[in-house]
Amino acid sequence: MQYNLTRIDPDAPNEQYPIGKRETVSDPLEDQVHKNIYMGKLEDVLNGAVNWGRKNSLWPYNFGLSCCYVEMTTAFTAPHDIARFGAEVIRASPRQADFMVIAGTCFIKMAPIIQRLYEQMLEPKWVISMGSCANSGGMYDIYSVVQGVDKFLPVDVYVPGCPPRPEAFLQGLMLLQESIGKERRPLSWVVGDQGVYRAEMPSQKEQRREQRIQVTNLRSPDEV
Protein backbone atom coordinates (compact mmCIF):
# COMPACT_ATOMS: atom_id res chain seq x y z
CA MET A 1 0.00 0.00 0.00
CA GLN A 2 1.24 3.46 -0.92
CA TYR A 3 1.30 6.27 1.64
CA ASN A 4 1.43 10.05 1.31
CA LEU A 5 4.15 11.40 3.59
CA THR A 6 3.83 14.98 4.85
CA ARG A 7 6.71 16.74 6.59
CA ILE A 8 6.97 20.27 7.92
CA ASP A 9 9.07 22.45 5.65
CA PRO A 10 10.20 25.61 7.49
CA ASP A 11 11.64 27.03 4.25
CA ALA A 12 8.32 26.86 2.39
CA PRO A 13 6.88 30.15 1.11
CA ASN A 14 4.30 31.81 3.31
CA GLU A 15 1.55 31.60 0.67
CA GLN A 16 1.83 27.79 0.66
CA TYR A 17 -0.61 26.02 2.98
CA PRO A 18 -0.02 23.82 4.81
CA ILE A 19 3.65 24.64 5.27
CA GLY A 20 5.11 21.28 4.37
CA LYS A 21 6.22 18.99 1.59
CA ARG A 22 4.59 15.77 0.42
CA GLU A 23 5.85 12.64 -1.27
CA THR A 24 4.60 9.13 -2.01
CA VAL A 25 6.32 6.36 -0.03
CA SER A 26 5.72 2.78 1.05
CA ASP A 27 4.35 1.66 4.42
CA PRO A 28 6.96 2.65 7.06
CA LEU A 29 5.90 -0.15 9.41
CA GLU A 30 6.60 -2.78 6.76
CA ASP A 31 10.07 -1.31 6.32
CA GLN A 32 10.58 -1.44 10.08
CA VAL A 33 9.51 -5.11 10.19
CA HIS A 34 12.11 -5.96 7.54
CA LYS A 35 14.80 -4.28 9.66
CA ASN A 36 13.77 -5.65 13.06
CA ILE A 37 10.74 -7.91 13.23
CA TYR A 38 10.31 -7.55 17.01
CA MET A 39 10.39 -3.74 17.09
CA GLY A 40 8.39 -3.58 13.88
CA LYS A 41 5.56 -5.74 15.25
CA LEU A 42 5.60 -3.84 18.55
CA GLU A 43 5.30 -0.53 16.75
CA ASP A 44 2.52 -1.97 14.59
CA VAL A 45 0.52 -3.01 17.67
CA LEU A 46 1.03 0.38 19.34
CA ASN A 47 -0.04 2.25 16.21
CA GLY A 48 -3.09 0.04 15.86
CA ALA A 49 -4.16 0.67 19.45
CA VAL A 50 -3.67 4.43 19.17
CA ASN A 51 -5.49 4.63 15.83
CA TRP A 52 -8.36 2.54 17.20
CA GLY A 53 -8.84 5.02 20.02
CA ARG A 54 -8.62 8.01 17.72
CA LYS A 55 -11.06 6.80 15.08
CA ASN A 56 -13.70 5.70 17.60
CA SER A 57 -13.75 8.96 19.58
CA LEU A 58 -13.85 11.69 16.95
CA TRP A 59 -15.17 14.93 18.43
CA PRO A 60 -16.58 17.31 15.78
CA TYR A 61 -16.30 21.07 15.90
CA ASN A 62 -19.71 22.77 15.88
CA PHE A 63 -19.25 24.89 12.79
CA GLY A 64 -21.25 25.43 9.62
CA LEU A 65 -21.47 27.79 6.67
CA SER A 66 -24.71 27.19 4.79
CA CYS A 67 -27.53 24.74 4.04
CA CYS A 68 -25.32 21.62 4.20
CA TYR A 69 -24.84 22.35 7.89
CA VAL A 70 -28.56 21.61 8.42
CA GLU A 71 -28.07 18.12 6.97
CA MET A 72 -24.99 17.65 9.11
CA THR A 73 -26.85 18.50 12.32
CA THR A 74 -29.65 16.14 11.30
CA ALA A 75 -27.13 13.30 11.56
CA PHE A 76 -26.90 14.03 15.30
CA THR A 77 -30.60 13.32 15.87
CA ALA A 78 -31.94 10.05 17.25
CA PRO A 79 -33.03 8.46 13.92
CA HIS A 80 -29.44 8.53 12.64
CA ASP A 81 -27.62 8.13 15.98
CA ILE A 82 -24.11 9.35 15.22
CA ALA A 83 -23.15 8.14 18.71
CA ARG A 84 -22.63 4.72 17.13
CA PHE A 85 -19.39 6.12 15.71
CA GLY A 86 -18.27 7.93 18.86
CA ALA A 87 -18.75 11.36 17.28
CA GLU A 88 -21.67 12.68 19.31
CA VAL A 89 -19.56 14.93 21.56
CA ILE A 90 -19.89 18.29 19.78
CA ARG A 91 -17.24 20.80 20.81
CA ALA A 92 -17.80 24.56 20.92
CA SER A 93 -14.07 25.29 20.80
CA PRO A 94 -11.69 24.21 18.03
CA ARG A 95 -9.05 23.49 20.67
CA GLN A 96 -11.16 20.59 21.94
CA ALA A 97 -12.23 19.19 18.55
CA ASP A 98 -10.70 16.40 16.49
CA PHE A 99 -12.17 17.19 13.09
CA MET A 100 -13.95 20.02 11.30
CA VAL A 101 -16.72 19.67 8.75
CA ILE A 102 -16.78 22.42 6.12
CA ALA A 103 -20.51 22.28 5.36
CA GLY A 104 -21.74 24.91 2.95
CA THR A 105 -20.57 27.71 0.70
CA CYS A 106 -17.14 29.11 1.56
CA PHE A 107 -16.88 32.78 0.64
CA ILE A 108 -13.51 34.46 0.23
CA LYS A 109 -14.14 36.62 3.29
CA MET A 110 -14.68 33.47 5.37
CA ALA A 111 -11.55 31.66 4.15
CA PRO A 112 -9.07 33.32 6.59
CA ILE A 113 -11.49 32.75 9.48
CA ILE A 114 -11.84 29.06 8.64
CA GLN A 115 -8.08 28.78 8.31
CA ARG A 116 -7.60 30.41 11.71
CA LEU A 117 -10.07 27.99 13.30
CA TYR A 118 -8.23 25.07 11.70
CA GLU A 119 -4.91 26.32 13.05
CA GLN A 120 -6.39 26.46 16.56
CA MET A 121 -7.22 22.74 16.45
CA LEU A 122 -4.67 20.49 18.08
CA GLU A 123 -2.94 17.65 16.27
CA PRO A 124 -4.05 15.17 15.14
CA LYS A 125 -6.87 16.88 13.25
CA TRP A 126 -8.88 16.13 10.15
CA VAL A 127 -11.19 17.93 7.71
CA ILE A 128 -14.35 16.72 5.95
CA SER A 129 -15.58 18.76 2.99
CA MET A 130 -19.35 18.33 2.83
CA GLY A 131 -21.39 19.36 -0.18
CA SER A 132 -20.74 20.57 -3.71
CA CYS A 133 -20.06 24.16 -2.63
CA ALA A 134 -17.34 23.13 -0.19
CA ASN A 135 -15.89 20.59 -2.62
CA SER A 136 -15.66 22.74 -5.74
CA GLY A 137 -17.68 25.91 -5.32
CA GLY A 138 -20.85 24.22 -6.57
CA MET A 139 -23.06 26.38 -8.75
CA TYR A 140 -21.38 29.54 -7.45
CA ASP A 141 -18.67 30.00 -10.06
CA ILE A 142 -18.21 33.64 -9.09
CA TYR A 143 -15.48 35.88 -7.76
CA SER A 144 -16.69 35.83 -4.14
CA VAL A 145 -16.75 32.03 -3.59
CA VAL A 146 -13.71 29.82 -3.03
CA GLN A 147 -13.72 27.06 -5.65
CA GLY A 148 -13.07 24.28 -3.16
CA VAL A 149 -11.84 24.47 0.42
CA ASP A 150 -8.83 22.33 -0.52
CA LYS A 151 -7.40 25.55 -1.96
CA PHE A 152 -6.39 26.52 1.58
CA LEU A 153 -7.08 23.48 3.81
CA PRO A 154 -5.89 19.86 3.63
CA VAL A 155 -9.11 17.88 3.08
CA ASP A 156 -9.27 14.22 4.12
CA VAL A 157 -12.76 13.21 2.92
CA TYR A 158 -15.08 14.72 0.30
CA VAL A 159 -18.84 14.18 0.66
CA PRO A 160 -20.69 14.99 -2.61
CA GLY A 161 -24.25 16.24 -2.88
CA CYS A 162 -26.31 19.43 -2.96
CA PRO A 163 -27.00 19.06 -0.15
CA PRO A 164 -25.81 15.59 0.93
CA ARG A 165 -28.19 13.51 2.98
CA PRO A 166 -27.28 12.71 6.60
CA GLU A 167 -26.53 9.15 5.49
CA ALA A 168 -23.90 10.52 3.09
CA PHE A 169 -22.28 12.41 5.94
CA LEU A 170 -22.23 9.24 8.06
CA GLN A 171 -20.60 7.35 5.19
CA GLY A 172 -17.99 10.10 4.95
CA LEU A 173 -17.38 9.76 8.67
CA MET A 174 -16.86 6.01 8.27
CA LEU A 175 -14.41 6.65 5.43
CA LEU A 176 -12.53 9.02 7.70
CA GLN A 177 -12.41 6.34 10.40
CA GLU A 178 -11.06 3.86 7.86
CA SER A 179 -8.39 6.34 6.81
CA ILE A 180 -7.39 7.06 10.42
CA GLY A 181 -7.04 3.34 11.09
CA LYS A 182 -4.35 3.15 8.38
CA GLU A 183 -2.45 6.30 9.35
CA ARG A 184 1.11 6.29 10.62
CA ARG A 185 1.71 9.18 13.01
CA PRO A 186 4.51 9.76 15.52
CA LEU A 187 3.68 8.28 18.92
CA SER A 188 5.60 11.07 20.62
CA TRP A 189 7.35 14.29 19.67
CA VAL A 190 10.67 12.75 20.73
CA VAL A 191 10.18 9.15 19.53
CA GLY A 192 10.27 7.92 15.95
CA ASP A 193 9.76 9.60 12.62
CA GLN A 194 7.92 12.93 12.91
CA GLY A 195 6.31 12.65 9.49
CA VAL A 196 2.61 11.95 8.97
CA TYR A 197 1.85 8.98 6.71
CA ARG A 198 -1.65 8.80 5.20
CA ALA A 199 -2.79 5.84 3.12
CA GLU A 200 -3.92 6.62 -0.41
CA MET A 201 -7.71 6.32 -0.43
CA PRO A 202 -9.27 5.70 -3.87
CA SER A 203 -12.56 7.43 -4.65
CA GLN A 204 -15.77 5.52 -4.05
CA LYS A 205 -16.76 6.28 -7.64
CA GLU A 206 -13.83 4.24 -8.94
CA GLN A 207 -14.27 1.46 -6.39
CA ARG A 208 -17.94 0.94 -7.29
CA ARG A 209 -17.66 1.35 -11.04
CA GLU A 210 -18.09 -2.38 -11.76
CA GLN A 211 -21.02 -2.57 -9.36
CA ARG A 212 -22.80 0.27 -11.17
CA ILE A 213 -22.16 -1.27 -14.58
CA GLN A 214 -23.78 -4.55 -13.51
CA VAL A 215 -27.02 -2.85 -12.44
CA THR A 216 -29.80 -3.57 -14.96
CA ASN A 217 -33.00 -2.73 -13.04
CA LEU A 218 -32.86 1.02 -12.54
CA ARG A 219 -35.30 2.51 -10.05
CA SER A 220 -37.64 5.29 -11.10
CA PRO A 221 -37.33 8.72 -9.45
CA ASP A 222 -40.41 7.93 -7.33
CA GLU A 223 -38.73 4.84 -5.90
CA VAL A 224 -35.38 6.41 -5.08
UniProtKB/Swiss-Prot annotation:
The gene is nuoB. Pfam families: Oxidored_q6. This is NADH-quinone oxidoreductase subunit B. The keyword Translocase applies. Keywords: 4Fe-4S, Cell inner membrane, Cell membrane, Iron, Iron-sulfur, Membrane, Metal-binding, NAD, Quinone, Translocase, Transport, Ubiquinone. It is an enzyme of class 7 (translocase). SUPFAM superfamilies: HydA/Nqo6-like. Residues 201-224 are annotated as: Disordered.
